[in-house]
Amino acid sequence: LSAPPKLTLKTMANLATKWSWGIGMLGAKRRGFGNIVGHVKGISDTSSLGSWTAEQFDPSLDWDKIAKLKEQWGGKVILKGILDAEDAKMALKVGADAIIVSNHGGRQLDGALSSIRVLPSILEAVGDQIDVHLDSGIRSGQDVLKAMAMGAKGTYIGRAYIYGLGAMGEAGVTSALNIIHRELDTTMALCGETNVEDLGRHNLLVPKDFEGRWQEYVGAGNA
């Protein structure tokens, strides 16, 4: 599937098996990125959006540039996508005000470690010096509790509210947030907690060697 969709023999054959859905979609309102199309120079439709998006990624970005950005901006800088304790230390060194432990929902690199698995080592490295948040894999209130009990200051969601948006629009987003809130409330009650600030490792049973011995294996491979 591409954006915008391209009519190929394969997609046409697929559409032929779903003709009722196809007819319904023909009469549906056209969707676009209203916060970008028509507001950014040179972006007038969805077709030109892809090229513009690709141009926003700077392959030469490094820690020195982040430090310079922090200096020029003068405001708070939060770095998302940290999956390694050494990167967390570098984020602290260049002046980041907080970091988000994230593998971007697992949609950038299929083999990336899960955020929750690397969270303990990152907290051990910098958790007492910088706020550490987490996203990727948060689907329920129980997931929120697990992350915060391990030491994250907060969590973020993506797909969870998008599902609600797709099903019911704005009301669906509100419903998704309420569901997660109720799940968190219920889970806390069953754990004997009334305040998220009181959550901790005592609320969890973490499997032995949960983080894995990744560094040891890497070292052995380089020996």
What are these regions, as identified by a protein language model?
Residues L61-I66, E71, L113-G127:
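Short loop-to-alpha-helix "cap/lid" segments that border enzyme active sites
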Residues G32, R117-D135, R139-A223:
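Alpha/beta catalytic cores of nucleotide-metabolism and tRNA/nucleoside-modifying enzymes
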Residues Q72-K76, L92-G106, V126-Q129, G151-T155:
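Glycine-enriched alpha-helix->loop->beta-strand junction motifs that scaffold or abut catalytic
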Residues K89-M90, D110-A112, V144-K146, A167:
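Short, well-ordered secondary-structure micro-motifs
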Residues L1-K93, G105-Q108:
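Active-site entrance/lid segments in N-terminal catalytic domains of soluble metabolic enzymes
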Residues G50, N103-L113, I162-L165:
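Glycine-rich, proline-tolerant flexible connector loops at the mouths of alpha/beta enzymes
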Residues K80-G81, S102-N103, S136, G158-R159:
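Short beta->alpha connector loops at strand-helix junctions that form conserved
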